[in-house]
Swiss-Prot record:
Coiled coil: none
Species per Swiss-Prot/TrEMBL record: Pectobacterium atrosepticum (strain SCRI 1043 / ATCC BAA-672) (Erwinia carotovora subsp. atroseptica)
Transcription in keyword set: no
Annotated carbamoyl phosphate binding sites: 55-56, 106, 135, 138, 268-269
Gene Ontology biological-process entries: 'de novo' pyrimidine nucleobase biosynthetic process; 'de novo' UMP biosynthetic process; amino acid metabolic process
HAMAP family assigned: Asp_carb_tr
Annotated EC: 2.1.3.2
Assigned keywords, A-Z: Pyrimidine biosynthesis, Transferase
Gene Ontology cellular component annotations, sorted alphabetically: cytosol
UniProt similarity note: Belongs to the aspartate/ornithine carbamoyltransferase superfamily. ATCase family.
Protein name: Aspartate carbamoyltransferase catalytic subunit
Catalytic activity: carbamoyl phosphate + L-aspartate = N-carbamoyl-L-aspartate + phosphate + H(+)
Length: 311
């Protein structure tokens, strides 16, 4: 098939239409069911991580290898000319784009991935997270997991818990689910980490139902998806972190009144916000969710690097 994502930058979930998302999810499902180990043979992909990452980097690089691509890059920008010699991000991307067919990039600065597209010479840039801004590939794997567990992406009751201010995953996921009908959002966070106003305004403009809550207990019986997040220590003042981190913790007993179809998701890493007794409940799905990252990222790589895709 001829696909609309060929040679397209994947920077924000807003860059993708509902049809784009559905296409990528279908490709991810196909690749999970039937591996394609030579789909990106002879392609070279740069894995450029200017910020620490475990799951995103490893799943992206696993996705690249399992599609047959060659991988170059770095996991620590301090060992690059940018980190050691003061080279600009623009120059770094301009050079890397001469070597590769696509660039996967994580950076602590909001907007860095969008900036990189201006200097990539048309080479597709895939945002693997830019500060507290966007994390579109995490969003795609979240959508894939919701569809896998619920059989749909519409009429979903979803609660998002914890750090809704700095947590880029919840921003992107809310924007993505807003493209599908009938979804209902429950936001559970301390005032200091509440969902940003621009997200709430977007939901209001689209007449999408949402509500703000102080505890998981208030809504657990209504939910299809419970999306937990950690309080991000690296983005908070130490005293503020200590005061906030233990306010919203999920324990197995909190799920006593849950619907049978409920799944607990988490972008990981977790710290204290999900106790280990939740791991053995039928509701826990966060490790399978992480595994789905391979297929979601394979799908995007396959689409941006193949004009016609036959699976």
């Amino acid at each position: 098939m001829v696909n609309p994502l060929y040679q397209k930058h994947i920077i924000s979930i807003n860059d993708l239409s509902r049809e784009d998302l559905e296409l990528a999810l279908n490709v991810a499902a196909s690749l999970k069911a039937k591996p394609q180990p030579e789909l990106l043979k002879h392609k070279v992909i740069a894995s450029c991580f200017f910020e620490a990452s475990t799951r995103t980097r490893l799943s992206f690089e696993t996705a690249m290898h399992r599609l047959g691509a060659s991988v170059v890059g770095f996991a620590d920008s301090n060992n690059t000319s940018l980190g050691k010699k003061g080279e600009t991000l623009a120059d770094t991307i301009s050079v890397i784009s001469q070597y590769v067919d696509a660039i996967v990039m994580r950076h602590p600065q909001e907007g860095a991935s969008r900036l990189a597209t201006e200097f990539s010479g048309g080479i597709p840039v895939l945002n693997a997270g830019d500060g507290a801004n966007q994390h579109p590939t995490q969003t795609l794997l979240d959508l894939f997991t919701i569809q896998e567990t619920q059989g749909r992406l519409n009429n979903i009751n979803i609660a998002m818990v914890g750090d809704l201010k700095y947590g880029r995953t919840v921003h992107s996921l809310t924007q993505a689910l807003a493209k599908f009908e009938g979804n209902r959002f429950y936001f559970i966070a301390p005032d200091a980490l509440a969902m940003p106003d621009y997200i709430l305004s977007m939901l209001k403009e689209k007449n999408i139902a949402y509500s703000l809550h102080n505890s998981i207990d208030e809504v657990v019986g209504e939910l299809d998806i419970l999306y937990m997040t950690r309080v991000q220590k690296e983005r908070l003042d130490p005293s503020e972190y200590i005061n906030i981190k233990s306010q919203f913790v999920l324990r197995a007993a909190d799920l006593d009144n849950a619907r049978p179809n409920l799944k607990v998701l988490h972008p990981l890493p977790r710290v204290d916000e999900i106790t280990i007794d939740v791991d053995t409940t039928p509701y826990a799905y966060y490790f399978q969710q992480a595994g789905n990252g391979i297929y979601a990222r394979q799908a995007l790589l396959a689409l941006v690097l193949n004009r016609e895709l036959v699976l």
